[in-house]
């Protein structure tokens, strides 16, 4: 899911998500194969994050482009944990040195800094988490606000369903994109979980409308 939560792996533990991602817009399909999202716990409330993917882009009538996407480095800090959980998760995203992926349309051209906050609360077996924040960038197209709401429930032991609405908007709030996602988590073992999600744009005035978003991954906890 796009909306983050305040959870961390725990001191000295890894949480590694390896996935196939897809995004379809009119005349274009972008695939991340694989996307790697690696997390490491420092103490009980800190998480270090590294994320990147190998992207494949096919535009109608053109050749397929492929290459390493941008890189994300992030730190999550859960600063409140007493029924209500609160965290902040600043993340810096940049094009890898020497890469021309931005010129080939595989990633954004300018570095950016997203500073979001996350909130989570459990209501009798239904957990609700939301995030909200701002993206700083020299590129006005990348700059703007983000926010999301995700509701989840464990319908049987080891099987969770999630419903999410996540949005982003321009700096002046005159253009926005809202995405609807349905996801599930299924435990494969005590240390691994299958992650699935499918979604699409509800509205998009920032660019081409996404008709399909997909995520198929496995989380391994070490």
Segments the model singles out, each with a brief description of its role:
Residues 1-222:
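Transmembrane beta-barrel domains of Gram-negative outer membranes and organellar outer membranes
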